[in-house]
């Protein structure tokens, strides 16, 4: 009898062990600078498509993410980057902190958004835009701005919000596009002189790319320098706001994914990166972003058409190479 009970107990423990093994999930740690609103929507998709992964998403602003990765360089705590500005990734490729990986299906993507050595793979793009509160504009008798130059009007003093470029990728693309417009690549200082004039009207620099639009929508500012889909979301929610894409040329950024060197959960990281460029994932991105890197997927209908926007031809390599110098100078001039 004792032997029978012992045998049954052993069988029970084996079943329990095997069941537990079957239910065990592979862990993966993901760093991202995608907006919280986006991640909340994407979560349902990746949980459905990757049921065997235990996915830990850590969301940080663009600047904070970079600082954290540098601090953890000797002992990486994340396995991959999901949706980070190419300008920043270029720098980390140079620093040797990214492991080349060719995710499944990458051949279907537009090649110009894929790193030649597969150090990163672009997934989408966003465009800098002004969020203009029409109610505040009317109350204060302000003219509708068409571009950056219009914001130098003294009437806008204290009524403009803009992202801090040291913390926000959106902020950096805005100031880097202005600097390039004014000849910074040729060594000219005109862009910095323009930013000094703009600073005189600045109400607040904010450590977020989306909050200038959200604060403007709530009536705290007349104009918030932000980016496309955040303005669209505020308008969708019923706030009295309108898009303005700078007539001088709107800056834009590409967001990309990368495998981190020293990833502790390599197989799980690769599985997530495969999913992150799948058609299903791209369709989710397209609900927020201006364009995705998988051809044939339409963008959201409430965003203005590409033909209606003048894009400034951004030089991502120049931006990456000069990023630290630009931010150091910006902080010296404007964070007093």
Place the predicted regions along the sequence by residue.
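A bilobed periplasmic-binding-protein/Venus flytrap-type ligand-binding module shared by bacterial periplasmic
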Residues: 131-136, 176-181, 253-265, 284-285
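Short, well-ordered beta-strand elements
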Residues: 25-35, 53-58, 159-160
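Short beta-strand->loop
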Residues: 98-105, 119-121, 149-152, 239-251, ...
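Extracytoplasmic ligand-binding site segments that recognize negatively charged/polar headgroups
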Residues: 33-40, 63, 77-217
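Extracellular/periplasmic bilobal clamshell ligand-binding domains
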Residues: 302-336
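A ligand-binding cleft/hinge motif common to bilobed small-molecule-binding domains
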Residues: 87-91, 217, 222-240
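Periplasmic-binding protein-like
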Residues: 155-163, 194-199, 205-206, 235-261, 276-299
């Amino acid at each position: 009898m004792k032997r029978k009970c012992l045998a049954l107990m052993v069988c029970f423990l084996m079943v329990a062990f095997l069941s537990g093994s079957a239910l065990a999930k592979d862990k993966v740690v993901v760093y991202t600078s995608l907006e919280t609103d986006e991640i909340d929507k994407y979560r349902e998709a990746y949980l459905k498509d990757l049921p065997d992964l235990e996915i830990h998403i850590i969301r940080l602003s663009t600047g904070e993410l970079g600082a954290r990765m540098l601090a953890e360089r000797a002992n990486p705590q994340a396995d991959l980057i999901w949706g980070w500005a190419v300008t920043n990734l270029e720098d980390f490729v140079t620093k040797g902190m990214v492991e080349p990986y060719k995710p499944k299906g990458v051949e279907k993507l537009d090649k110009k958004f894929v790193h030649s050595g597969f150090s990163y793979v672009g997934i989408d793009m966003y465009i800098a835009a002004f969020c203009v509160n029409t109610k505040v504009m009317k109350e204060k008798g302000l003219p509708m701005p068409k571009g950056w130059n219009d914001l130098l009007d003294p009437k806008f003093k204290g009524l403009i919000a803009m992202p801090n470029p040291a913390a926000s990728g959106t902020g950096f693309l805005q100031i880097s596009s202005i600097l390039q417009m004014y000849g910074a690549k040729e060594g000219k200082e005109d862009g910095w002189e323009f930013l000094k004039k703009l600073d005189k009207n600045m109400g607040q620099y904010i450590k977020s790319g989306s909050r200038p639009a959200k604060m403007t929508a709530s009536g705290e500012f007349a104009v918030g320098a932000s980016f496309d889909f955040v303005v669209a979301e505020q308008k969708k929610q019923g706030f009295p706001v309108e898009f303005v894409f700078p007539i001088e040329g709107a800056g834009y950024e590409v967001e990309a994914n990368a495998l981190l060197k020293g990833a502790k959960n390599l197989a799980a990281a690769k599985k997530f990166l495969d999913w992150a460029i799948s058609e299903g994932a791209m369709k989710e991105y397209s609900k927020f972003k201006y364009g995705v890197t998988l051809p044939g997927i339409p963008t959201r209908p409430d965003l203005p058409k590409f033909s209606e926007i003048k894009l400034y031809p951004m030089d991502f390599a120049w931006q990456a190479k000069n990023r630290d110098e630009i931010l150091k100078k910006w902080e010296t001039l404007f964070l007093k």
